Amino acid sequence: MAQAGSADPGVGGHWAAGPRCAPWRWALALLWLATAAGGPSRRQWPVPYKRFSFRPEPDPYCQAKYTFCPTGSPIPVMKGDDVIEVFRLQTPVWEFKYGNLLGHLKIMHDAIGFKSTLTGKNYTMEWYELFQLGNCTFPHLRPEMNAPFWCNQGAACFFEGIDDIHWKENGTLVLVATISGNTFNQMAKWVKRDNETGIYYETWTVQASPTKGAETWFESYDCSKFVLRTYKKLAELGAEFKKIETNYTRIFLYSGEPTYLGNETSIFGPTGNKTLALAIKRFYYPFKPHLSTKEFLLSILQIFDAVIIHREFYLFYNFEYWFLPMKFPFIKITYEEIPLPKRNETLSGL
């Protein structure tokens, strides 16, 4: 995303005009200048998620505690006349390790299941972090680097099979639609493009307040958003979804209008803002991983002081830094209904 700046008011006309022309020319000039100067500051909210032309190779420094997509396989090409069942899959985050612990807090992970009628094979498709959630939410402060170092990538994972117990025991496994093999193949091409261009994970949804219709400053980009994008694409391709309730976890931050600060070079580079750079690193320091119990408790107090008492939060979005003037209630986890999409009636027979 381009950095906002004031437009160059290079006026081509001559302001040294005769007395009778001066008033209206001055008025037009001032109006033009006001429009030009004010235009870039009126940002688009929410800030659009930046897409890329390719997915970069991860830095070797970034290591996953749990291997990403260990049994992944290419998405198969289905026969056009196959009938594919589409399943909504949802389970508590880290259910494989903690069971239903996070399910009580409605912190859920979402995925999509498919079953081919012709072959009887099942498949799972999900989108999640390459290096776990903490690395996608907060950076590493490496002594040899001036700028915070981010291990933040998310990607799609497709593999054969659906672990029924994993999804059913504490979550959801329910049929939501039936599509043709042709529609599945079209979806697969879209998934490939989506995965190559949407490369990083975003934990937070940032809004002005919890009230309905409040301004949204930034949207999250996570597992549930991938599922919602895929459902929307299937509906565009003609899929008809069942009328069932579907809820999703969202983690909100609440703030006044964000202030754009700059990117890594403009803040942490040789000619960067040293005061701002230090403030950002101080903010992120309590979030560092591998803490002892004593360090962890101290960090909680430091985070409380920064976010609640001083009402400050530094957000990294689109590889750029923003300042959030935090507002009550500061942070909230919700489990909201987002309806399944309606079929595109202009595309029949798909």
From Swiss-Prot:
Spans within the Lumenal topological domain: 43-350
A cellular component term, taken from the record's GO annotations: endoplasmic reticulum
Biological function: Exhibits palmitoyl protein thioesterase (S-depalmitoylation) activity in vitro and most likely plays a role in protein S-depalmitoylation.
UniProt-recorded name of the protein: Bis(monoacylglycero)phosphate synthase CLN5
Glycosylation-annotated residues: N122, N135, N170, N195, N247, N263, N273, N344
GO terms assigned for molecular function: bis(monoacylglycero)phosphate synthase activity; D-mannose binding; hydrolase activity, acting on glycosyl bonds; long-chain fatty acyl-CoA hydrolase activity
Catalytic-site annotation from UniProt: H109 (proton acceptor), C223 (nucleophile)
Catalytic activity, as annotated: S-hexadecanoyl-L-cysteinyl-[protein] + H2O = L-cysteinyl-[protein] + hexadecanoate + H(+)
Region feature (Membrane-anchoring): 296-335
InterPro entries on file: CLN5 (IPR026138)
Post-translational modification: N-glycosylated with both high mannose and complex type sugars. Glycosylation is important for proper folding and trafficking to the lysosomes. Can undergo proteolytic cleavage at the C-terminus, probably by a cysteine protease and may involve the removal of approximately 10-15 residues from the C-terminal end.
Cytoplasmic side: 1-25
Family: Belongs to the CLN5 family.
Keywords in alphabetical order: Disulfide bond, Glycoprotein, Hydrolase, Lysosome, Membrane, Neurodegeneration, Neuronal ceroid lipofuscinosis, Signal-anchor, Transferase, Transmembrane, Transmembrane helix
Transmembrane segments: 26-42
EC identifiers of the protein: 2.3.1.-, 3.1.2.22
Species assigned in the record: Canis lupus familiaris (Dog)
Lineage: Eukaryota, Metazoa, Chordata, Craniata, Vertebrata
Subunit structure: Multimer. Interacts with SORT1, RAB5A and RAB7A. Interacts with PPT1, TPP1, CLN3, CLN6, CLN8, ATP5F1A and ATP5F1B.
Gene from which this protein is expressed: CLN5
